[in-house]
């Protein structure tokens, strides 16, 4: 099962947040694809 990306926190640099949200979207896609 895919591991949920770590939240970098409010004061993380923009690149880190962008990377996190991309990983999170990918993670959600993986989970929903497996479920349905």
UniProtKB/Swiss-Prot annotation:
Any one GO cellular component localisation term in the record: extracellular space
Coiled coil: none
Signal peptide as annotated in the record: none
Modified residues (Tyrosine amide): 36
Domain of life: Eukaryota
Keywords for this protein: Amidation, Neuropeptide, Secreted
Molecular function GO labels: neuropeptide hormone activity; neuropeptide Y receptor binding
Cellular location(s): Secreted
Pfam hit, one: Hormone_3
BP-aspect Gene Ontology terms: feeding behavior; neuropeptide signaling pathway
Function: NPY is implicated in the control of feeding and in secretion of gonadotrophin-release hormone.
UniProt family annotation: Belongs to the NPY family.
Protein name in the entry: Neuropeptide Y
Species, as recorded: Oncorhynchus mykiss
């Amino acid at each position: 099962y895919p591991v949920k990306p770590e939240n970098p926190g409010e004061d993380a640099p923009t690149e880190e947040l962008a990377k996190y949200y991309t990983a999170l979207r990918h993670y959600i896609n993986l989970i929903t694809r497996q479920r349905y």
